[in-house]
Every structure is written in C-alpha cells, then in structure tokens.
Amino acid sequence: MTHDPYYETMYILRPDIPEEEVESHLTKYRDMLVEAGAEVLDNQMRGKRRLAYPIAKHKEGIYVQLSHNGDGQHVAVLEKAMRLSEDVIRYLTVKQEGPLPAPRVMPGSEAAQQQQAEAAASAD
C-alpha cells in the first residue's frame, strides 16, 4: 500500500509572546495553507523548550509542529510568511514519505491527563 507524501513544518516562536498571540499564529498559518489549497493534517503546539544554542539572543522558544499535504507550492507561501514574521525565529519544512504517525501528547498537558484518566478507567 502506497501513501502519499506529506510535509512537516516545525517552527519556533519567540518565547516572550503572549499565549493569545501564539494561538493566532497557529490559526494564521493553518488558514494560510488551506487558502493555498493544502490539507492540514495535524497542528500541535509542543510548548516552550530550551534551545540547543541561542537564536536571535533567545535561549528558549515555543515549538509548533504542522503536518500538511498538497502539491508543494503551498510550502513556498508558508515559508515566505514565516520568514517575514518577527515572531518566528526558526522554521524547517521536511517532505515525509509513508503514513502520518499518530499524534504524540506532551507530558503534563490536558490531553496527557485525559489519556491517563481513560487508561485508568479502562483498567478498572
């Protein structure tokens, strides 16, 4: 069984932007892809993490992962918008082959707590 290729874009936002603005970035880039004719498969906020090395004098960043598929033309539109944004300090888009992996849950998040509660309920 063959699977269509898809794209994964990981981008890092400045750590000092407010939570509402982070949500607006998630929505903005998702909507931009849809307008360009792509299908958004997954949009996950990975949270604030320490960077391996300082980027633009920042030691931390807010990581966001965006999985999408389309004809590839939408990637240029997305990356141009990210390049022009002062809030995005780094981005990378990679073409993936194979099936889309199951979404991972960040430990300590509401989704992780909900998974633990469901697992405990099914164990009883």
Swiss-Prot record:
Binds together with bS18 to 16S ribosomal RNA. Keywords: Ribonucleoprotein, Ribosomal protein, RNA-binding, rRNA-binding. The lineage of its organism: Bacteria, Bacillati, Cyanobacteriota, Cyanophyceae, Synechococcales. Residues 99-124 are annotated as: Disordered. This is Small ribosomal subunit protein bS6. Residues 109-124 have a biased composition (Low complexity). The keyword RNA-binding applies. The gene is rpsF. Belongs to the bacterial ribosomal protein bS6 family.
